[in-house]
Protein backbone atom coordinates (compact mmCIF):
# COMPACT_ATOMS: atom_id res chain seq x y z
CA UNK A 1 0.00 0.00 0.00
CA UNK A 2 1.35 3.40 -1.01
CA UNK A 3 -0.29 6.59 0.20
CA UNK A 4 0.21 10.05 -1.28
CA UNK A 5 -0.17 12.65 1.47
CA UNK A 6 -0.77 16.33 0.77
CA UNK A 7 -2.38 19.38 2.37
CA UNK A 8 -3.03 23.08 1.88
CA UNK A 9 -1.33 24.44 5.02
CA UNK A 10 2.11 23.85 3.52
CA UNK A 11 4.89 21.29 3.70
CA UNK A 12 6.03 22.35 7.19
CA UNK A 13 2.58 22.36 8.80
CA UNK A 14 2.21 20.39 12.06
CA UNK A 15 -0.94 18.68 10.80
CA UNK A 16 0.93 17.24 7.83
CA UNK A 17 3.72 15.96 10.07
CA UNK A 18 1.18 14.39 12.43
CA UNK A 19 -0.68 12.70 9.57
CA UNK A 20 2.52 11.25 8.14
CA UNK A 21 3.55 9.95 11.57
CA UNK A 22 0.14 8.34 12.07
CA UNK A 23 0.27 6.46 8.76
CA UNK A 24 3.99 5.74 8.33
CA UNK A 25 3.92 2.29 9.93
CA UNK A 26 0.72 1.31 8.10
CA UNK A 27 1.77 2.05 4.53
CA UNK A 28 4.56 3.46 2.41
CA UNK A 29 3.85 7.18 2.58
CA UNK A 30 5.05 9.90 0.21
CA UNK A 31 4.44 13.54 1.05
CA UNK A 32 4.06 16.13 -1.71
CA UNK A 33 2.82 19.44 -0.34
CA UNK A 34 2.85 23.14 -1.25
CA UNK A 35 5.96 25.09 -0.32
CA UNK A 36 3.75 27.69 1.38
CA UNK A 37 0.27 28.03 2.84
CA UNK A 38 -2.30 27.55 0.07
CA UNK A 39 -5.47 27.65 2.16
CA UNK A 40 -8.45 28.56 0.01
CA UNK A 41 -6.79 27.43 -3.22
CA UNK A 42 -9.72 25.12 -4.01
CA UNK A 43 -9.07 22.94 -7.09
CA UNK A 44 -6.84 25.38 -8.93
CA UNK A 45 -4.02 24.09 -11.12
CA UNK A 46 -0.92 26.14 -11.89
CA UNK A 47 -0.83 26.76 -15.64
CA UNK A 48 1.25 29.94 -15.97
CA UNK A 49 4.66 28.64 -14.86
CA UNK A 50 6.57 25.37 -14.37
CA UNK A 51 6.38 23.42 -11.13
CA UNK A 52 9.63 22.61 -9.33
CA UNK A 53 9.66 19.79 -6.76
CA UNK A 54 12.29 19.93 -4.03
CA UNK A 55 13.03 17.07 -1.62
CA UNK A 56 13.57 18.24 1.96
CA UNK A 57 15.85 16.71 4.59
CA UNK A 58 12.93 14.76 6.11
CA UNK A 59 12.04 13.23 2.73
CA UNK A 60 8.95 15.36 2.16
CA UNK A 61 8.64 16.86 -1.32
CA UNK A 62 7.95 20.59 -1.46
CA UNK A 63 6.26 21.99 -4.57
CA UNK A 64 5.77 25.57 -5.71
CA UNK A 65 2.13 24.92 -6.50
CA UNK A 66 -1.33 24.22 -5.14
CA UNK A 67 -2.62 21.12 -3.32
CA UNK A 68 -4.25 19.98 -6.56
CA UNK A 69 -0.92 20.43 -8.36
CA UNK A 70 0.73 18.23 -5.74
CA UNK A 71 -1.68 15.34 -6.21
CA UNK A 72 -1.87 15.75 -9.98
CA UNK A 73 1.91 15.68 -10.35
CA UNK A 74 2.31 12.89 -7.82
CA UNK A 75 0.01 10.58 -9.75
CA UNK A 76 1.03 11.79 -13.21
CA UNK A 77 4.72 11.09 -13.33
CA UNK A 78 6.67 12.57 -10.42
CA UNK A 79 6.64 9.35 -8.39
CA UNK A 80 8.32 6.22 -9.68
CA UNK A 81 5.81 4.04 -7.81
CA UNK A 82 2.16 5.02 -8.19
CA UNK A 83 0.18 5.71 -4.99
CA UNK A 84 -2.82 3.53 -4.18
CA UNK A 85 -4.71 6.24 -2.31
CA UNK A 86 -4.60 9.93 -1.43
CA UNK A 87 -4.94 11.37 2.07
CA UNK A 88 -5.10 15.13 2.59
CA UNK A 89 -4.59 17.03 5.84
CA UNK A 90 -4.58 17.29 8.71
CA UNK A 91 -5.88 20.82 8.17
CA UNK A 92 -5.62 23.17 11.15
CA UNK A 93 -9.11 24.59 10.92
CA UNK A 94 -12.49 23.12 10.01
CA UNK A 95 -13.72 22.39 6.51
CA UNK A 96 -17.45 22.28 7.17
CA UNK A 97 -20.45 23.16 5.05
CA UNK A 98 -19.69 25.62 2.28
CA UNK A 99 -16.00 25.64 3.28
CA UNK A 100 -15.51 22.65 1.00
CA UNK A 101 -15.99 24.87 -2.07
CA UNK A 102 -12.81 26.79 -1.24
CA UNK A 103 -10.73 24.26 0.66
CA UNK A 104 -7.42 23.16 -0.78
CA UNK A 105 -7.46 20.27 1.68
CA UNK A 106 -10.69 18.93 0.21
CA UNK A 107 -9.54 19.74 -3.33
CA UNK A 108 -6.45 17.54 -2.96
CA UNK A 109 -8.71 14.61 -2.04
CA UNK A 110 -11.07 15.39 -4.93
CA UNK A 111 -8.15 15.37 -7.35
CA UNK A 112 -7.07 12.00 -6.01
CA UNK A 113 -10.53 10.57 -6.55
CA UNK A 114 -10.77 12.16 -10.00
CA UNK A 115 -7.60 10.23 -10.79
CA UNK A 116 -9.27 7.04 -9.52
CA UNK A 117 -7.71 6.71 -6.07
CA UNK A 118 -9.72 6.34 -2.87
CA UNK A 119 -9.28 9.62 -1.02
CA UNK A 120 -9.82 11.22 2.38
CA UNK A 121 -9.66 14.83 3.56
CA UNK A 122 -9.01 15.37 7.29
CA UNK A 123 -9.54 18.65 9.13
CA UNK A 124 -9.20 19.57 12.80
CA UNK A 125 -11.38 22.17 14.48
CA UNK A 126 -8.58 24.36 15.80
CA UNK A 127 -5.81 26.58 14.50
CA UNK A 128 -3.69 25.31 17.40
CA UNK A 129 -2.26 21.76 17.52
CA UNK A 130 -3.08 21.08 21.19
CA UNK A 131 -5.28 18.02 20.56
CA UNK A 132 -3.87 17.14 17.16
CA UNK A 133 -3.19 13.61 18.40
CA UNK A 134 -6.96 13.06 18.42
CA UNK A 135 -7.20 13.92 14.73
CA UNK A 136 -4.19 11.74 13.93
CA UNK A 137 -5.82 8.83 15.76
CA UNK A 138 -8.99 9.05 13.68
CA UNK A 139 -7.05 9.53 10.46
CA UNK A 140 -5.23 6.27 11.09
CA UNK A 141 -8.42 4.48 12.15
CA UNK A 142 -10.40 5.51 9.07
CA UNK A 143 -7.61 5.02 6.55
CA UNK A 144 -7.04 1.50 7.84
CA UNK A 145 -10.78 0.80 7.81
CA UNK A 146 -11.09 1.85 4.15
CA UNK A 147 -10.01 -1.69 3.24
CA UNK A 148 -13.48 -2.84 4.34
CA UNK A 149 -15.25 -0.02 2.47
CA UNK A 150 -16.47 -0.22 -1.09
CA UNK A 151 -16.22 3.52 -1.68
CA UNK A 152 -18.74 4.67 -4.30
CA UNK A 153 -17.23 5.92 -7.56
CA UNK A 154 -16.28 9.61 -7.72
CA UNK A 155 -16.82 10.02 -3.97
CA UNK A 156 -14.42 11.25 -1.30
CA UNK A 157 -14.83 11.33 2.46
CA UNK A 158 -14.50 14.70 4.17
CA UNK A 159 -13.68 14.19 7.84
CA UNK A 160 -13.77 16.86 10.57
CA UNK A 161 -12.47 16.12 14.06
CA UNK A 162 -13.41 18.19 17.15
CA UNK A 163 -10.72 19.90 19.20
CA UNK A 164 -11.05 17.53 22.14
CA UNK A 165 -8.91 15.00 23.97
CA UNK A 166 -9.43 11.54 22.52
CA UNK A 167 -11.35 10.29 25.55
CA UNK A 168 -13.92 13.08 25.13
CA UNK A 169 -14.86 12.20 21.55
CA UNK A 170 -18.40 10.76 21.58
CA UNK A 171 -18.15 8.73 18.38
CA UNK A 172 -18.42 9.13 14.61
CA UNK A 173 -21.44 10.41 12.67
CA UNK A 174 -22.24 10.31 8.97
CA UNK A 175 -23.40 13.82 8.06
CA UNK A 176 -24.51 16.13 5.29
CA UNK A 177 -22.97 19.52 4.62
CA UNK A 178 -24.46 22.38 6.58
CA UNK A 179 -24.51 25.94 5.28
CA UNK A 180 -22.99 29.23 6.29
CA UNK A 181 -24.46 32.70 6.03
CA UNK A 182 -22.89 35.09 3.56
CA UNK A 183 -19.35 36.11 4.52
CA UNK A 184 -18.63 39.61 5.73
CA UNK A 185 -17.58 42.19 3.17
CA UNK A 186 -13.87 42.43 2.33
CA UNK A 187 -11.92 44.75 4.63
CA UNK A 188 -10.36 47.76 2.93
CA UNK A 189 -6.84 48.76 3.95
CA UNK A 190 -4.54 51.54 2.76
CA UNK A 191 -0.78 51.02 2.54
CA UNK A 192 1.81 53.69 3.51
CA UNK A 193 1.82 54.98 -0.07
CA UNK A 194 -1.91 55.54 -0.07
CA UNK A 195 -2.80 52.56 -2.23
CA UNK A 196 -6.03 50.78 -1.39
CA UNK A 197 -6.10 47.03 -0.87
CA UNK A 198 -8.55 44.48 0.48
CA UNK A 199 -8.46 41.54 2.85
CA UNK A 200 -11.00 38.78 2.28
CA UNK A 201 -13.09 38.60 5.46
CA UNK A 202 -13.80 35.59 7.61
CA UNK A 203 -16.35 32.97 6.62
CA UNK A 204 -19.97 33.60 7.53
CA UNK A 205 -21.67 32.28 10.64
CA UNK A 206 -23.46 28.94 10.59
CA UNK A 207 -26.92 29.30 9.04
CA UNK A 208 -27.89 25.64 8.67
CA UNK A 209 -26.31 23.65 11.46
CA UNK A 210 -29.16 21.46 12.62
CA UNK A 211 -29.18 17.77 13.44
CA UNK A 212 -27.64 15.69 10.68
CA UNK A 213 -25.20 18.37 9.54
CA UNK A 214 -21.45 18.33 9.90
CA UNK A 215 -21.62 21.49 12.04
CA UNK A 216 -23.99 19.86 14.50
CA UNK A 217 -21.93 16.68 14.80
CA UNK A 218 -18.66 18.37 15.71
CA UNK A 219 -20.31 20.80 18.13
CA UNK A 220 -21.78 17.78 19.91
CA UNK A 221 -18.34 16.17 20.16
CA UNK A 222 -18.57 13.71 17.27
CA UNK A 223 -16.22 13.15 14.37
CA UNK A 224 -18.10 14.11 11.21
CA UNK A 225 -17.79 12.16 7.96
CA UNK A 226 -19.43 13.69 4.90
CA UNK A 227 -19.33 11.89 1.54
CA UNK A 228 -18.67 14.38 -1.27
CA UNK A 229 -19.21 13.69 -4.96
CA UNK A 230 -17.23 14.90 -7.94
CA UNK A 231 -20.43 15.01 -10.00
CA UNK A 232 -22.14 18.30 -9.13
CA UNK A 233 -25.05 17.83 -11.54
CA UNK A 234 -28.35 18.86 -9.94
CA UNK A 235 -30.51 16.00 -11.19
CA UNK A 236 -33.59 17.07 -9.20
CA UNK A 237 -33.68 20.34 -11.10
CA UNK A 238 -34.04 18.77 -14.55
CA UNK A 239 -37.86 18.80 -14.58
CA UNK A 240 -38.29 22.51 -13.85
CA UNK A 241 -35.38 23.43 -16.13
CA UNK A 242 -36.87 21.40 -18.99
CA UNK A 243 -40.17 23.23 -18.52
CA UNK A 244 -38.30 26.54 -18.66
CA UNK A 245 -36.43 25.50 -21.81
CA UNK A 246 -39.66 24.41 -23.52
CA UNK A 247 -40.93 27.94 -23.10
CA UNK A 248 -37.89 29.28 -24.98
CA UNK A 249 -38.39 27.13 -28.08
Swiss-Prot record:
Provide the catalytic activity annotation. a ribonucleoside 5'-phosphate + H2O = a ribonucleoside + phosphate
Q: Which residues bind a divalent metal cation?
A: 8-9, 39, 91
The UniProt entry, under Pfam families, shows: SurE
Cofactor(s) required, per the database record: a divalent metal cation
Gene Ontology MF terms in the entry:
3'-nucleotidase activity; 5'-nucleotidase activity; exopolyphosphatase activity; metal ion binding; nucleotide binding
| EC number, UniProt record | 3.1.3.5
Q: How is the cofactor bound?
A: Binds 1 divalent metal cation per subunit.
Q: What InterPro entries does UniProt report for this protein, alphabetically?
A: SurE (IPR030048), SurE-like_Pase/nucleotidase (IPR002828), SurE-like_sf (IPR036523)
Q: Which cellular components does GO assign to this protein?
A: cytoplasm
Class of the enzyme per the UniProt entry, highest EC level: hydrolase
What domain of life does the UniProt record list for this protein's source? Bacteria
- Keywords, in A-Z order: Cytoplasm, Hydrolase, Metal-binding, Nucleotide-binding
The entry's localization annotation reads: Cytoplasm
Q: Which NCBIfam families match?
A: PRK00346.1-3, PRK00346.1-4, surE
Q: What function does the entry list?
A: Nucleotidase that shows phosphatase activity on nucleoside 5'-monophosphates.
What's the family? Belongs to the SurE nucleotidase family.
Supply the PANTHER family for this chain.
5'-NUCLEOTIDASE SURE (PTHR30457), 5'_3'-NUCLEOTIDASE SURE (PTHR30457:SF12)
- The name this protein carries in UniProt is 5'-nucleotidase SurE
Which organism does this record belong to? Pseudomonas savastanoi pv. phaseolicola (strain 1448A / Race 6) (Pseudomonas syringae pv. phaseolicola (strain 1448A / Race 6))
Lineage of this protein's species?
Answer: Bacteria, Pseudomonadati, Pseudomonadota, Gammaproteobacteria, Pseudomonadales
Give the gene symbol: surE
